[in-house]
């Protein structure tokens, strides 16, 4: 599969065309950003780690009936993916109170939620990715009510699978972000699943093992990412 012109560059990844218009190559970068690009830096080998974790988790989800954009892992930093028309919604699933949920509603950080909360955010950096209800999303042309219900249903299934997987590896899946896209009339899970897009806490100590270590200058960022990779791939 030949890597051709760059189609897109985001905060953490580049996307390249291939010989097949239905397939793209997603390349993971070491760049790190937080607070909608207001804080920038690099995390050594983050791209390698996130690609490995994402490929493993997409494969796991496929085994549980969740269709994803992953075709195969190509190299340390690259995966071959189905070319998606990305839906302009970020789907966030929350199991434990942290981050913006604490700031908005006054939860104590670490509060275990009665049931998982599934939220929709408009994917728009200029607007700081605002929280939206389904009616907003439909009015903005993000998707239909039926499509949004499907996204939430998929997110709930993904949460069930991933919580169990990470619990076996002594990690709490605090919350995580998902992105979906359309491919030949089907909605597929896209983007990545990694310490960039999830909050992971150690089950015994609640040590943060994700991008919060970069966001809040907690140190040992590379070590945290590598520890998640070790637990995902080796256990």
From Swiss-Prot:
EC number annotated for this UniProt entry: 6.3.2.6
Pathway as given in its UniProt record: Purine metabolism; IMP biosynthesis via de novo pathway; 5-amino-1-(5-phospho-D-ribosyl)imidazole-4-carboxamide from 5-amino-1-(5-phospho-D-ribosyl)imidazole-4-carboxylate: step 1/2
Signal peptide: none
GO molecular function: ATP binding; phosphoribosylaminoimidazolesuccinocarboxamide synthase activity
GO biological process, one term: cobalamin biosynthetic process
This protein's UniProt keywords: ATP-binding, Ligase, Nucleotide-binding, Purine biosynthesis
One Pfam family matching this protein: SAICAR_synt
Top-level taxon of origin: Bacteria
Catalytic activity: 5-amino-1-(5-phospho-D-ribosyl)imidazole-4-carboxylate + L-aspartate + ATP = (2S)-2-[5-amino-1-(5-phospho-beta-D-ribosyl)imidazole-4-carboxamido]succinate + ADP + phosphate + 2 H(+)
Protein name: Phosphoribosylaminoimidazole-succinocarboxamide synthase
Organism: Chlorobium chlorochromatii (strain CaD3)
């Amino acid at each position: 599969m030949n890597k051709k012109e760059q189609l897109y560059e985001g905060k953490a990844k580049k996307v390249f065309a291939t010989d097949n218009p239905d397939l793209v190559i997603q390349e993971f970068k070491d760049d790190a950003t937080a607070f909608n690009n207001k804080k920038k830096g690099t995390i050594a080998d983050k791209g390698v780690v996130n690609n490995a974790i994402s490929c493993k988790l997409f494969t796991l989800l496929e085994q549980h009936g969740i269709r994803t954009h992953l075709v195969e892992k190509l190299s340390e930093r690259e995966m071959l993916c189905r070319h998606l028309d990305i839906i302009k919604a970020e789907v966030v699933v929350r199991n434990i109170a942290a981050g913006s949920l604490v700031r908005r509603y006054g939860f104590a950080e670490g509060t275990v939620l009665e049931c998982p909360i599934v939220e929709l955010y408009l994917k728009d950096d200029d607007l700081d990715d605002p929280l939206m209800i389904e009616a907003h999303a439909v009015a903005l042309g993000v998707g239909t009510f039926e499509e949004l219900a499907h996204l939430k249903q998929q997110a709930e299934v993904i949460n069930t699978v991933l919580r169990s997987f990470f619990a076996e590896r002594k990690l709490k899946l605090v919350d995580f972000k998902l992105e979906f896209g359309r491919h030949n009339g089907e909605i597929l899970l896209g983007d990545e699943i990694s310490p960039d897009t999830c909050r992971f806490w150690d089950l015994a100590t609640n040590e943060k093992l994700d991008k919060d270590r970069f966001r809040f200058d907690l140190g040992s960022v590379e070590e945290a990412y590598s520890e998640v990779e070790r637990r995902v791939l080796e256990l």
